[in-house]
């Protein structure tokens, strides 16, 4: 029998505010750079087991997965929120709050969405709800940057041909993105002879050459087709040994080019 869950859900939300805040704080202060989500993923798995989601498990990509009614089904809907953040391990995950806001590196991308998803799972478990289709709740890994969607790729490999649709909770709840945005990532390495800034002056400097290349990138006219949008970004640039040494090995830059024209 179908149930009108509206009032039940609203009552649950009202009663769960403090629990959600506690979980948000506990998760937010756990460092979780892409590829290094181990501690946060382990926390999520333990939390799920603690609320009675006994079939939750962690796969080889560090996804934490809670399957419901998925056995033998090819109509699975995936709901996911990612565990990794863009912040490297050396960034302090310091929690701060005032009268209206909470602050912590990565809290909005994507820890708060992860918490909301987990609180939804708790409601389903507590009320013994069984969906009419297969459902996977996934705390997925390696969503950010050079994580390159490793977790989601693993999910589609393991459930090949069985996933009907995927909903990922990321960013603001005020918008829905229903069209995929493709991207290409490039690492550019530049190697030259280099040498001492005085004695080898005039020889090609790898850092200068890389800077010229990046400057020329900014002069490229981007395609404009209908309402589509193409962008680029130079995310990191590194290299060099000393202020008096013309870099003779390999500085590099990582370039991201997301484009709605390329899916």
What are the roles of these predicted feature ranges?
Residues 26, 119-126, 212-219:
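Short glycine/serine- and small hydrophobic-enriched flexible loop segments
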Residues 101, 106, 110-183, 234:
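Acidic/histidine-rich catalytic neighborhood of metal-dependent amide-processing enzymes
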Residues 158-212, 256, 261-263:
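Metal-dependent peptidase/peptidase-like ectodomains
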